[in-house]
Structures are given as C-alpha cells and as structure tokens.
C-alpha cells in the first residue's frame, strides 16, 4: 500500500513538473511584441501587453478620442502614414497620451492631420463652432514625444500636464489658418507640470507658440515660432495652480507674430511668477509688442490697470534683439506698485517701432 502511495505522489510530481509555467512566460512573450493597428478602437481596446504600438493610417471616427492613456509602462507608440479625424463639433481631445516611460514618435513621412479648416471660423474657442482640442499629453511621467509632424489643428495643439516630459523636434504647422479663420491655435499649453523640456520645436500658428500657465522646471530651447502671439508666460492667475517657477526660454526665433516675449498676469488674482529667463531671442516682423509684461489681464484682455497679487520676481531678460513694425511698441511694462522686482535686463536691442509712454512701475534695471 505504501509503495502505491509513493508511486502516486511521484506521478503527481511528474505532472506538475511537466505542466507549462503559468502566465509569466506568455505575458513576457506578449509584452515583447509589436502590435499594428489600423483602427482607433483596436488601439484603444487592445494596446495592453504590446511593447510597441504602430498606428497605421488611422482614421479616428467623429467625436472619438484616439486614447492611448492606459498603455503599459515602457510602451513605444509609432505613427505611420496619415492619421485623420472625423468631423464633429465637440470639445475633444482628438488624441490622448498617458503613462510612465512612454515614447511617442513617427516613421518617416508620417503626418497627424487635424484638417482644422472644417472647424475654423475666426472665433477659435471664443464662439462659433465647438472645436476639439487636439492632443492631451497628460499624466505622462519620464516620457518622450519626438519628431511628430502635426498639421492644421482645430484649436490648441498640445496640452501638457506632465512630469519629466521631453518634447523633441515637434513640428506644428497651422499656417493654412492664416487665411482661413484659424484662431486660438496655441502650440504648447503647459500647466500643473514639473519638468517639461521642449527642444527644437517649429510652430506656425495664430496664437501663443508656447503658453506656460503654471508649473516649474520648464525649458523651451531652439524653437522657431511664426505667425502667432509669441513666447508667453500666462495668463497666470485664476486657476487651481497659479505658480510659475524656474522657466528658461532660450536660443529661439519669433517672426511675423503679434508679440515676441510676453508675460501676463490676471487682474486681482493671486499667484507668482519667479525665476524666469528669456535669453538669446531673435525677433522680426513683430506687429504689436517686442516685449510686453503686464499685470492687468481680465477675461482674456488687458484692462490698463495693474494689480499686485501675482508678483513677477527674479526675471532675466538677456539678449532679446530684433525688429518690430513701425506702429508696434518695442517694450511695454505695466506692473503694480512693488509687484515686479529683482529683474536683470541685459542686451535688449529692439528697434523699428514706437516707445511706450504708458509704462508703470518699471523695476530697477529694466527699461521701457
């Protein structure tokens, strides 16, 4: 009887040993795979487990988001061919990314085309048709978006709320909107972020090339901006997060735009702007202001009356040079009493326009 029991146990052990390892091997095999999708729903629903996701000539249905915010950590996302979107009046976004250690890139010749002219009516987000935001780079951590070619977004292009995100060699071309009613087509809108590094961007649009509304440790370098509203901080104030700190905007050009360098804070709001540096910025064809810093914005427009609730401190303007149009203002500074301080102002040489007679409370060292 004892020998039978031993034989039974031995047989059981052999069966266990011979059984395949459970999910670990199959999971690892699946994780190492490249998944190619030709439909947005496939990518959204089946991306889990793919180490690389290839989006092959995706046509996103009207009113839907190409949602890649729930992919596995470490995933690489590749755009192939032309990505397009069906038409519907809605708020969007058309694309959403999220996750940790994510890489987003495209193959040669690919383009992400918003076909924004279907929505453009000259009003942007201020009225008319409801227009979808284009891309949300939200909840990304330790990630990179590189080499994307984006064309004709309905309104704002890339909204960033992230930690340690690199955006490298991004092209946003909304130049078709110049004559077709493009409006509020911001390039990069940054808020509630820590560590955002935008390098080598090319932006052609009808609004801010970059707008930093809140966040810290932000860099914009080697950028080329044209047609829009320039390199902007703000408007700061009136949001959940109203702190902008440690920003460097450097080695960039702004051409044929309303403004070159701009900082704006909200009338009667609270917050702070500190440790901001603009350096080696080249301007040409500026139509409104070469440099404009004002603490008077309300409902998206200047009031002419500055307030002190969002101080601008430790600001460096170094090597901002170039030309503005003859009816533009070279430099305009409108600060509240004592709310602009510790500024460094060097190598500013802007010519061709008018000198403002309306500057107020210009801090020591700056000139207006």
Curated annotation (Swiss-Prot):
The keyword Transport does not apply. It is an enzyme of class 3 (hydrolase). InterPro entries: Glyco_hydro_28 (IPR000743), Glycosyl_hydrlase_28 (IPR050434), PbH1 (IPR006626), Pectin_lyas_fold (IPR012334), Pectin_lyase_fold/virulence (IPR011050). One of its GO terms (cellular component) is extracellular region. It is found in: Secreted. Residues 19-31 form a propeptide. Its EC number is 3.2.1.15. It holds the Pfam family Glyco_hydro_28. The active site is at residues 207, 229. This is Probable endopolygalacturonase A. It comes from Neosartorya fischeri (strain ATCC 1020 / DSM 3700 / CBS 544.65 / FGSC A1164 / JCM 1740 / NRRL 181 / WB 181) (Aspergillus fischerianus). The lineage of its organism: Eukaryota, Fungi, Dikarya, Ascomycota, Pezizomycotina.
């Amino acid at each position: 009887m004892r020998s039978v029991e031993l034989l039974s146990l031995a047989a059981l052990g052999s069966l266990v040993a011979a059984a395949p390892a459970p999910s670990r091997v199959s999971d690892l095999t699946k994780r190492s795979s490249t998944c190619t999708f030709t439909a947005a729903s496939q990518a959204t629903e089946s991306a889990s487990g793919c180490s690389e996701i290839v989006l092959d000539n995706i046509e996103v249905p009207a009113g839907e988001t190409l949602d890649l915010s729930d992919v596995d950590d470490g995933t690489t996302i590749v755009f192939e061919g032309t990505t397009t979107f069906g038409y519907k009046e809605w708020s969007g976004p058309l694309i959403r990314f999220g996750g940790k250690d994510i890489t987003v890139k495209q193959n040669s010749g690919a383009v992400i085309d918003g076909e924004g002219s279907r929505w453009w009516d000259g009003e942007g987000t201020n009225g008319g048709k409801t227009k979808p935001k284009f891309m949300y780079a939200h909840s990304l951590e330790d990630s990179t978006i590189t080499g994307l070619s984006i064309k004709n977004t309905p309104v704002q292009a890339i909204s960033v709320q992230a930690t340690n995100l690199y955006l490298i060699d991004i092209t946003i071309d909304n130049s078709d909107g110049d004559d077709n009613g493009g409006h509020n087509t911001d390039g990069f809108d940054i808020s509630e972020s820590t560590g955002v590094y935008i390098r080598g961007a090319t932006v052609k649009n009808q609004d801010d090339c970059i707008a930093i509304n809140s966040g810290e440790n932000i860099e914009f370098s080697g950028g080329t901006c044209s047609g829009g509203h320039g390199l902007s901080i703000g408007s700061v104030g009136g949001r959940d997060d109203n702190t902008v700190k440690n920003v460097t905007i450097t080695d960039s050009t702004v051409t044929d735009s309303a403004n070159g360098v701009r900082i704006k804070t909200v009338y009667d709001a609270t917050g702070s702007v500190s440790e901001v540096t603009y350096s080696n910025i080249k301007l040409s064809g500026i139509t409104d202001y070469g440099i404009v810093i004002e603490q008077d914005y309300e409902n998206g427009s200047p009031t002419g009356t500055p307030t002190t609730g969002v101080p601008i401190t430790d600001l460096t303007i170094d090597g901002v040079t170039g030309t503005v149009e003859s009816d533009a203002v070279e430099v305009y500074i409108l600060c509240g009493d004592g709310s602009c301080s510790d500024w460094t102002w060097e190598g500013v040489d802007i010519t061709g326009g008018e000198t403002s007679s309306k500057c107020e409370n210009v801090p020591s060292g700056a000139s207006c």
